[in-house]
From Swiss-Prot:
GO cellular component, one term: DNA-directed RNA polymerase complex
Protein name: DNA-directed RNA polymerase subunit beta'
Family annotation (CDD domains): RNAP_beta'_C (cd02655), RNAP_beta'_N (cd01609)
UniProt source species: Methylobacillus flagellatus (strain ATCC 51484 / DSM 6875 / VKM B-1610 / KT)
Domain of life: Bacteria
Note describing how the cofactor binds: Binds 1 Mg(2+) ion per subunit.
GO MF annotation, one: magnesium ion binding
Oligomeric form and interacting partners: The RNAP catalytic core consists of 2 alpha, 1 beta, 1 beta' and 1 omega subunit. When a sigma factor is associated with the core the holoenzyme is formed, which can initiate transcription.
Entry similarity comment: Belongs to the RNA polymerase beta' chain family.
Key words of the record: DNA-directed RNA polymerase, Magnesium, Metal-binding, Nucleotidyltransferase, Transcription, Transferase, Zinc
Length: 1409
């Protein structure tokens, strides 16, 4: 019967749409949706279970309960379709109309919609220009509002209390009209003339000068203009008719035992209906005003709760004191409609099971349990059974499959052949968390996974589970095979390095196989080819590690792809010779002629991918894996307690450290060092001692004596024992990178060392024992401290990291490659990244896979090596390196001019595929995943490992690392003192060392107060000191000579006298202004200089006198009236007193950068280029004046406790730092521009990741910065429709400007706005995407008022509305549809599109020899 009914169901045509609009509904509109009015609060009759008439579930309004059957049962069957029963009034139709038919409630009194009232900023308040508090007082019947003042002195919109109103009525009678409640607000809205209001505001906007006012007017103007444009009437924000949700969407289900389970909405609706009916009755009875008012207020509250429970006043609760879930709660939050049902759908044809290792699989295969496959591929099996004639109907086929006969298994084998399945492991942090494999059937119930893909899935076999999904359609299968097959995903999209890299056992096996042993069996034998070596090894004539000579065949791949064989004799080991058998043709033997550690193997696979292509590499990786496992098994490496060799020197090292500590303690007791210094030094001593023990241990582990064939110690000619690299199992595991690290081995056999407390501070007594000797109770207890902290941190970290990824994905989800070339000539000048004199990232790494924005010129001949628009691959960057070019301008995502997307040329190479990115690639999501995925590896905060900190602090000089010529940057300033030393007086001077070709080799920051050991333009040798300084104090140096004159230096007021107990010398120390008494707070202790005539020395080229301010904690070393020369020290600041500012590190730092938060005590940048002088100080602030080149002066007030790095008379350029402190990204953007900002964010983010050893390509960060900068602020509206100060999408401004210019108008000018990722996600054009991210209510409220249209450009919106996403193959589909809609036949166009998407099909199963 059911199948028969299906024939009659009308096939509903799927609607095709291009955009979704949201707007306020008018009362008429609501009535037009409705199928009738709900008049009674009853739901269903508890005896008959039939819905009550006119109730919330009424069948007459909403439709029948059963298909094609009216309620009283008079009409049944299909033949009566469409009849309306005259007895019960129910239309005979499908029962599913109860999911779509709405009803309405006619409200007896209008009610304000709470979203437009309470969602901040209040829209009602904005339109009426009345404060929210006042509107609430009117709505909730606490005050009257004047609607029509008539001939009275009252004004429209004025509030009157009850008493006011009565006195005014006595005074003026019925001249004026004042009302309370929603009727009043509705009347005000209805009688408002939007048009004149807008004109008035536009006029005001032009006249006013105050910032705050402009902001306020612009906001109001935006809303009013939206009302005008979209044709939405403001009075619709007040409801007269309330729509009722279809009953199937708020079901009422009878439970056994006569109780009902119901949706909270029914309760909320019942309250509204009850109060509404009561109000109607009261109005009919002409009840006293006060009772009616109370009922109206209750109705307002009931409707408020229905729409958004708990937004105002008390939360409505059900019978069990639980808050009721309102309509707003249904759509927002993680469990709401958007994130739970639209973005988090469950899919059919999927299963999950535990994974086990499948070492015999090929890279593109997985093992699928038979039981699972049978269930997943059921429809295919049914079809096959029918085709083969083994079953006549689906039912018969079903039965056959349930019997699981032999023919079913044969068919299953047939069905899954070449049909890829998708495997996914949660959490899916990047696109490699879902990959396609060809299933092979296995017994048992566990999925078998190829070991090499574990790194991509971050899987291990300790009970992890994975989900299997079946791509059904042919297109889906093809995409899975060409794009997602594991063998096509060799490279990581985050950094372009191979991700299919052997680890653990495989590494150990390969390492063991390629090590060499001295005096091993068969050393020095010669072999004609590898086959002979294999035979000798199999018969035990020669040891795996023996040095032998062998002839090997290698293949050179010519340029034209021809392979040329050459035979060479190599002296190598047996293991390496055997390994050479699996080397792909085209790779030289030299790449494996070394002990293969993990890093080496990674390089090997990378080289293979670049030289012989993906297919050979995949086969090679598989063979490496099989070989590694085989030899790891043969090696039989195991560890025992005797492998942990404790160094004999350990006792003595610890004893000497203890003696040093005792000495420090004695110094502390006698008052020579402070508590802080003592702590730092003790921690430092133990840190060093631990390192020494570790070094001794590693040295002992690293070497062993060689035994000859008889087991005697082998000796060389002089009779000394021969040593070789150790075959100690623990050492081999750590050295090869298979498991463990030097730090862990150190804990096993050295000493555990210093431990951290949960707050990150170091406990100064270290654990001197190791795990081999065992810990005592105290040591064990100290260990638990750090361990517990680690576990707690991990849990927090995972949540935080996931949230960061979510925000990143949300801000970039609509960024897709939409065109090939946007034609811009902009880009970023890129050079090698140098930190502290070391090249952290060379130029070739930074420009690899980018497109040149300008011609790359040969520095010697100035001829074009690579024209602009060239994609720089490995060969090109090597060539650029060889030519010694040190700066290249490359295209970048930041400067791409494509609107709604990005162009392939600006993005450059697709890192996961190794060639120029394809059209339709979702680069935004890839960027977000690449940055978010390593998030869990980042620490929550950087610990100051005390030892590390104090050792870093005691750097006292910079040395050159290479030979070359020294140059100082323009910011370097120094003076020569009486001793002829050159003392640096600039804060950010740098010394650059260039080689003979003038290329920059290294650059070093030279701190203030350092003594230069070299002069500008002179040659230096490697290792030569460039500058030295005292690491423990920061000096304050005078640039001018003269006689010292103190100002405000008063003992006991601004400075305190300190007498050193040991030496008896006294010195003056500046007191913290916060601790000073009343008047003296504003005094600044400073020094002026007088010349021979007693006149104040002036700043060179200026009128201001030289004055040097002493800051907090300064120890003043000069006396009043003392003569000082240039470059002499006036005072010094002890370094330990200036506390190490706690650096935010790890994950919070990355989040802080992407959220573009201004740091707490940010430094100040110069707003203009000019000369600095100091003005008159105010209370607590110092006044700094910059006089620009036109002589205009700009004043800045700076808190006293801030340290001004600039000094009187200094010339600063716009954007230069003048006050110490972390940079504020907003300032960088405003003063130095987008490129500087991008560079700042990229460098800072990379610093955090580099610290953890994570590689991420810069372009991912650039993509995110592009999204953070996509909004602009209008600085001059010109003839466009924008409002001054409005924030809009950059693309919209450009489009609008083009339109205006075409009509010879004046375009709008704008400045870039930097938004944090959360803000940027919420301010996107797509309201669907923003609403599903955060603050759903606010987003939807705003969108409804503006009558917003969502063009469905991003990925997220399309997922939500259930269309193909406009990325990948979906992009071509949408383009074609758009062309079809435009009426252009587009068959050829899609072929061209497909041409752009080069799919590399790797054959299904590469045969492994």
């Amino acid at each position: 019967m059911k199948a028969l009914l299906d024939l009659f169901k009308q096939v509903t045509q799927e609607e095709e749409f291009d955009a979704i609009k949201i707007a306020l509904a008018s009362p008429e509109k609501i009535r037009s949706w409705s199928y009738g009015e709900v008049k009674k609060p009853e739901t269903i009759n508890y005896r008959t279970f039939k819905p009550e008439r006119d109730g919330l579930f009424c069948a007459k309004i909403f439709g029948p309960i059963k298909d094609y059957e009216c309620l009283c049962g008079k009409y049944k069957r299909l033949k009566h379709r469409g009849v309306i029963c005259e007895k019960c009034g129910v239309e005979v139709t499908l029962s599913k109309v109860r999911r779509e038919r709405m009803a309405h409630i006619e409200l007896a009194s209008p009610v304000a919609h709470i979203w437009f009232l309470k969602s901040l900023p209040s829209r009602l308040g904005m339109v009426l220009d009345i404060a929210l508090r006042d509107i609430e007082r009117v709505l909730y019947f606490e005050a009257y509002i004047v609607i029509d003042p008539g001939m009275t002195p009252l004004t429209r919109g004025q509030l009157l209390t009850e008493d006011d109103y009565l006195s005014k009525v006595e005074e003026y009678g019925d001249e004026f009209n004042a009302v309370m409640g929603a009727e009043a607000v509705r009347e005000l809205l209805r009688t408002m003339d939007i048009h004149t209001e807008i004109e008035k505001l536009r006029r005001e906007l032009g006249e006013t000068g105050s910032e705050a006012k402009i902001k306020k007017i612009a906001k109001r103007l935006k809303v009013l203009e939206a009302f005008q444009k979209s044709g939405i009437k403001p009075e619709w924000m007040i409801l007269e008719v309330l729509p009722v949700l279809p009953p199937e969407l708020r079901p009422l289900v009878p439970l056994d035992g006569g109780r009902f389970a119901t949706s909270d909405l029914n309760d909320l609706y019942r309250r509204v209906i009850n109060r509404n009916n009561r109000l109607k009755r009261l109005l009919e009875l002409k009840a006293p005003e006060i009772i009616v008012r109370n009922e109206k207020r209750m109705l307002q509250e009931a409707v408020d709760s229905l729409l958004d429970n708990g937004r105002r006043g008390k939360v409505m609760t059900g019978a069990n004191k639980r808050p009721l879930k309102s309509l707003a709660d249904m759509i927002k939050g993680k469990g709401g409609r958007f994130r739970q049902n639209l973005l988090g759908k469950r899919v059919d044809y999927s299963g999950r099971s535990v994974i086990v290792v499948g070492p015999q699989l090929k890279l593109h295969q997985c093992g699928l349990p038979k039981k699972m496959a049978l269930e997943l591929f059921k429809p295919f099996i049914f079809h096959k059974l029918e085709v083969l004639g083994l079953a006549t109907t689906i039912k018969a086929a079903k039965k056959k499959v349930e019997e699981e006969g032999p023919e079913v298994w044969d068919i299953l084998e047939d069905v899954i052949r070449e049909h890829p399945v998708l495997l996914n492991r949660a959490p899916t942090l990047h696109r490699l968390g879902i990959q396609a494999f060809e299933p092979t059937l296995v017994e048992g119930k566990a999925i078998q996974l190829h070991p090499l893909v574990c790194a991509a899935f971050n899987a291990d076999f300790d009970g992890d589970q994975m989900a299997v999904h079946v791509p059904l359609s042919l297109e889906a299968q093809m995409e899975a095979r060409t794009l997602m097959l594991a063998s096509n995903n060799v490279l990581s999209p985050a950094n372009g390095e191979p991700i299919i890299v052997p680890s653990q056992d495989i590494v150990l096996g390969l390492y063991y196989m390629t090590r060499e042993k001295k005096a091993a069996r068969g050393e020095g034998m010669r072999f004609a080819n590898v086959a002979e070596v294999q035979r000798a090894y199999d018969s035990g004539q020669v040891d795996l590690h023996a040095r032998i000579t062998v002839r090997l065949r290698e293949f050179d791949v010519e340029v034209d792809g021809q392979k040329r064989e050459k035979i060479t004799r190599y002296e190598t080991t047996v293991g390496r010779a055997l390994l050479s058998e699996i080397l792909p043709a085209g790779l030289p033997f030299s790449v494996i002629d070394k002990a293969l550690k993990k890093k080496e193997i990674s390089r090997l696979i990378n080289a293979s991918f670049r030289r012989v292509g993906i297919r050979e590499t995949v086969i090679f990786a598989d063979k490496l894996m099989y070989t590694g496992y085989t030899y790891a098994t043969k090696a039989g490496i195991s560890i025992s307690i005797n492998d942990m060799l404790v160094p004999p020197e350990k006792e003595q090292l610890i004893a000497s450290a203890e003696a040093e500590v005792k000495e420090i303690e004695d110094q502390y007791v006698s008052g020579l060092v402070t508590q802080g210094e003592r702590y730092n030094k003790v921690v430092d001593i133990w840190g060093r001692a631990g390192d020494k023990v570790a070094d001794a241990m590693m040295k002992q582990l690293r070497e062993e004596v060689v035994l000859d064939a008889n087991g005697e110690v082998a000796k060389d000619a002089e009779g000394n024992p021969i040593k070789q690299e150790s075959f100690n199992a623990i050492y081999m595991m750590a050295d090869s990178g298979a498991r463990g690290s030097a730090a862990q081995v150190r804990q096993l056999a050295g000493m555990r060392g210093l431990m951290a407390k949960p707050d990150g501070s170091i406990i100064e007594t270290p654990i001197t024992a190791n795990f081999r000797d065992g810990l005592n109770v105290l040591q064990y207890f100290i260990s638990t401290h750090g361990a517990r902290k680690g576990l707690a941190d991990t849990a927090l970290k995972t949540a935080n990291s996931g949230y960061l990824t979510r925000r990143l994905v949300d801000v970039t989800q609509d960024l897709v490659v939409t065109e090939h070339d946007c034609g811009t000539t902009e880009g970023l000048y890129t050079k090698a990244l140098v930190k502290g004199g070391e090249v952290v990232e060379p130029l070739h790494d930074r420009i690899l896979g980018r497109v040149a924005a300008l011609d790359v010129l040969n520095p010697e001949t100035q001829e074009v090596v690579y024209p602009a628009g060239t994609l720089l691959t490995e060969d090109e960057v090597e060539h650029i390196d060889a030519l010694g070019i040190d700066e290249v301008k490359v295209r970048t995502a930041l400067t791409c001019e494509t609107r709604y997307g990005i162009c392939a040329k600006c993005y450059g190479r697709d890192l996961g595929r190794g060639k120029l990115i394809n059209m339709g690639e979702a680069v935004g999501v890839i960027a977000a995943q690449s940055i978010g995925e390593p998030g869990t590896q980042l620490t929550m905060r950087t610990f100051h490992i005390g030892g590390a900190v104090s050792r870093a602090a005691s750097v006292s000089q910079v040395e050159s690392k290479s030979n070359g010529i020294v140059h100082f940057t323009s910011t370097m300033r120094y003076v020569t003192n009486a001793r002829g030393e050159q003392v640096v007086i600039s804060r950010n001077g740098e010394a650059i060392i260039q080689d003979e070709n003038g290329r920059e080799r290294e650059r070093h920051k030279v701190p203030y107060g350092a003594t230069l050991q070299i002069t500008d333009g002179k040659p230096v040798k490697a290792g030569q000191a460039l500058a030295t300084w005292d690491p423990h104090t920061r000096p304050i140096i005078t640039e001018y000579a003269g006689r010292v004159k103190f100002e405000n230096v008063e003992e006991g007021v601004t400075v305190a006298k300190q007498v050193d107990e040991v030496t008896g010398l006294s010195s003056l120390v500046v007191i913290d202004p916060k601790q000073r008494a009343g008047q003296s707070k504003g005094l600044r202790p400073q020094v002026k200089l007088l010349d021979a005539n007693g006149v104040e020395v002036k700043v060179a080229g200026g009128e201001a006198p030289v004055s040097v301010t002493f800051q907090l904690g300064c120890i003043i070393t000069v006396k009043d009236g003392q003569e000082v020369g240039v470059g002499e020290v006036l005072a010094r600041i002890p370094q330990e007193s200036s506390k190490t500012r706690d650096i935010t590190g790890g994950l919070p730092r990355v989040a802080e950068l992407f959220e573009a938060r201004s740091p707490k005590d940010a430094g100040l940048l110069a707003e203009v280029t000019g000369t600095i002088s100091f003005g008159k100080d105010t209370k607590g602030k110092q006044r700094l004046v910059i006089t620009d080149l036109d002589g205009v002066s700009h004043e800045f007030l700076i808190p006293k406790d801030k340290h001004v790095t600039a000094h009187d008379g200094q010339v600063v350029t716009k954007g230069e730092s003048i006050v110490d402190g972390p940079a504020d990204p907003q300032d960088i953007l405003r003063l130095q521009g987008r490129e500087a900002l991008a560079r700042y964010i990229i460098d800072e983010v990379q610093d955090v990741y580099r610290l953890q050893g994570v590689k991420i390509n810069d372009k991912h960060i650039e993509v995110i910065v592009r999204q953070m900068l996509r909004r602009v602020r209008i600085t001059d509206a010109g003839d466009t429709s924008f409002i001054l100060g409005e924030q809009v999408e950059r693309a919209d401004v450009l489009t609008e400007n083009e339109r205006v210019l075409a009509q010879d108008g004046r375009p709008a000018s704008f400045e870039y706005v930097l938004l944090g990722i959360t803000k940027a996600s919420l301010s996107t054009d797509s309201f669907i995407s923003a609403a599903s991210f955060q603050e759903t209510t606010r987003v939807l409220t705003e969108a409804a008022i503006l009558g917003k249209r969502d063009e469905l450009r991003g990925l997220k919106e399309n997922v939500i509305v259930g269309r193909l996403i406009p990325a990948g193959t979906g992009l071509a589909y949408h383009e074609t549809r758009k062309r079809n809609v435009a009426g252009v036949d587009s068959a050829p166009a899609i072929i061209e599109d497909a041409g752009n998407v080069q799919l590399e099909e790797t054959s299904g199963n590469p045969e492994v020899a």
